[in-house]
UniProtKB/Swiss-Prot annotation:
Protein localization: Nucleus; Cytoplasm; Melanosome; Cell projection, Lamellipodium
PTM comment text: Phosphorylated.
Protein name: Macrophage-capping protein
Protein encoded by which gene: Capg
Gelsolin-like repeat positions: 28-107, 147-222, 264-342
GO cellular component, one term: lamellipodium
Assembly description: Interacts with NUP62. Interacts with NUTF2 and RAN; involved in CAPG nuclear import.
Domain of life per record: Eukaryota
Length: 349
């Protein structure tokens, strides 16, 4: 149990509303700001809060958990995250980042990469030896299926491609929807729609989207992926298998504290889900843990206790399902749903 933050006074300055990147290291339930010249340096024994305020109130709040950080420190970080999220009107999408398994969005804040250093504030020493990870700001999605079509992130390589599916290569300012010669029309439409959704919701409509057919790859694709080899043949029967796998890889749970404890009730055990299942009065867990990620959706009319317990619910769910501790968590306020989240639902409105 962690001591709540006093109602009077805030440990965060008014500048948390300012655009740009804000980083704090957690020290004894207090956020200590990190100087700009030290952005990108993370100590394995510590936990951090990373806030990015983008245009049009598009804020993202990340909890970064060092591999050697203590449970107490992680809990304190969660308490501060709840306070900061409330201070910002619960606008931010929240993410839990585990050292070595950070999301592409998190990595994009640090174009020079991350530097991991040993030690932490609790251990009273900070070694200067560091290891740098490259900035992973490029993504590749495979779009596959006939009925339950799903985009799944793949390794950034021609080895991930085949002639029977569509792929989205997201390079930030340019988004390529590449369609194999044997891909079906539904996959092609899905790839186009998802590329446009990424442009509109994640790039504020400022990225360029290009539809590419097999054999007409632009120079930028070749520069990123290397010379194009002969690609694997696609198999239409795999689309049927993918439909079954995609449907079974996700489940939807309702969160309730009616009994005084947080309880989960499964409301759908396969996707695509009906969007009407997401009731504004409640919070929900979308379980895609078999693919390494779970989502918490917070209805705008859900009670304060349920909304503030989202991180706690996520941690408990990961433990209960025996998922990897590296499982990524994304907490979405109603109205801030990402294109990847929306693809689990039919007829999203």
């Amino acid at each position: 149990m962690y001591t709540p933050i006093p109602q009077s006074g805030s440990p965060f300055p008014a500048s948390v509303q300012d655009p740009g990147l804000h980083i704090w290291r957690v020290e004894k339930l207090k956020p200590v700001p990190i100087a700009r010249e030290n952005h990108g340096i993370f100590f394995s024994g510590d936990s951090y809060l990373v806030l990015h305020n983008g245009p049009e109130e598009a804020s993202h709040l990340h909890l970064w958990i060092g591999q050697q950080s203590s449970r107490d420190e992680q809990g304190a970080c969660a308490v501060l995250a709840v306070h900061l999220n409330t201070l910002l009107g619960e606008r931010p999408v929240q993410h839990r980042e585990v050292q070595g398994n950070e999301s592409d969005l998190f990595m994009s804040y640090f174009p020079q990469g991350l530097k991991y250093r040993e030690g932490g504030v609790e251990s009273a020493f900070h070694k200067t030896t560091s290891g740098t990870t490259p900035a992973a700001i490029r993504k590749l999605y495979q779009v596959k299926g006939k009925k339950n079509i799903r985009a799944t992130e793949r390794a950034l390589s021609w080895d991930s491609f085949n002639t029977g599916d569509c792929f989205i290569l997201d390079l930030g300012q340019n988004i390529f929807a590449w369609c194999g010669g044997k891909s079906n029309i539904l996959e092609r439409n899905k790839a186009r729609d998802l590329a446009l959704a990424i442009r509109d919701s994640e790039r504020q409509g400022k990225a360029q989207v290009e539809i590419i057919t097999d054999g007409e790859e632009p120079a930028e694709m070749i520069q990123v992926l290397g010379p194009k080899p002969a690609l694997k043949e696609g198999n239409p029967e795999e689309d049927i298998t993918a439909d079954q796998t995609n449907a079974q890889a996700a489940a939807l749970y309702k969160v309730s504290d009616a009994t005084g404890q947080m309880n989960l009730t499964k409301v759908a055990d396969s996707s695509p889900f009906a969007s009407e299942l997401l009731i504004p009065d409640d919070c929900f867990v979308l379980d895609n843990g078999l693919c390494g990620k779970i989502y918490i959706w917070k209805g705008r009319k859900a009670n304060e206790k349920e909304r503030q317990a989202a991180l706690q619910v996520a941690d408990g769910f990961i433990s209960r399902m025996r998922y990897s501790p590296n499982t990524q968590v994304e907490i979405l306020p109603q109205g801030r749903e990402s294109p990847i989240f929306k693809q689990f639902f039919k007829d999203w409105k």
